[in-house]
Amino acid sequence: MKKILFILLLLVINAYSNELFTLPDESNFLKEKIRYEILSSKESIFIAMYNFSYKNIAKDLIKASKNGVKVTVVLDKSKVEANDKIYNFLKEANIKVIIPNDSKKMHLKTMIFDDKLALIGSLNFTKKSFENNHDLVYFTKDRKIIQKLKDIRAKFE
């Protein structure tokens, strides 16, 4: 009986460890989830985002940074122009922004919150992506996935 209860408990915990959002249908729910995770983070937030122009997310990252959270953003160099608004907005707020200087496209769309929760998907952080595109975003607490993402993060830092 104890074994069955333990297995059920693990299943319940696992059910809440993974969430899949489909866009554009669940766009508003996803925006709230991302905002909640950013503002609830205590230690660190890592983002690797191919295209990032959504200012509300940038504002939340700045709030988190001002609350002592280490925020690191990796952007693709082809998407960051000299006068890029989000890039400058984040840099002016002392957010660590990395632009890889290699020949490969930085096409990732991922986040890690406090090294405990990961976002993986096809979504760029643009208004168009949230409202007009068919995209998927998956949240997971799977340790193996998070470790792989941390290994990717280490390549950029």
PLM region spans:
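Boundary at the C-terminal end of the N-terminal hydrophobic targeting segment
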Residues: 15-17
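A general structural motif
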Residues: 24-30, 54
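DNA replication sliding-clamp ring fold and its partner-interaction surfaces
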Residues: 33, 37-43, 146-153
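Primarily the HKD phosphodiesterase
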Residues: 36-92
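Solvent-exposed loop/turn segments at secondary-structure junctions
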Residues: 51-55, 77-81, 103-106, 117-118, ...
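Signature of lipid phosphatidyltransferase scaffolds
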Residues: 117-157
